[in-house]
Amino acid sequence: MKLLVFSDVHLDAPFRWAGPDLARKRRSALRAAVTRICHVAEQESVDAVLCAGDLYEHEYFTPDTAQFLRASFAELARPVFLAPGNHDWFGPRSLYAQVQWSPNVSVFREDRLQPVELAEGLTLWGAAHRAPANTDGFLERFVVDR
């Protein structure tokens, strides 16, 4: 089984250190990276795609970014799993909660590890940050039931 795993894209990052033109170019490059990730997923015929957090910046995301992500992942002919990180944490006002995702997209919503069986004998475990910073680690008190 082939998985494409990525993280820390930080779409809509403000790039405060850059001038307006450079910041705009950097944000455009981040979108291009997501487009490239989707292209590689198709080209390499991966079985699933996983974003392991910080896909976007919670404080700065726009409706356009929500639509871009929805459309990008809907075009993939494979499952997509999104695990919200500390910069794009899951909550009622998060992009993750507001978007009507296509059936191939699953968002981890709990702050404890949840299993998803990908294939016989292969389980993906994922969780969501539910705030900008979690004090407990996801592995504390975690036991795999065998």
Model-derived segments and spans:
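N-terminal active-site segment of His-dependent metallophosphoesterases
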Residues: 1-68
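His/Asp/Glu-rich metal-coordinating catalytic cores
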Residues: 48, 59-146
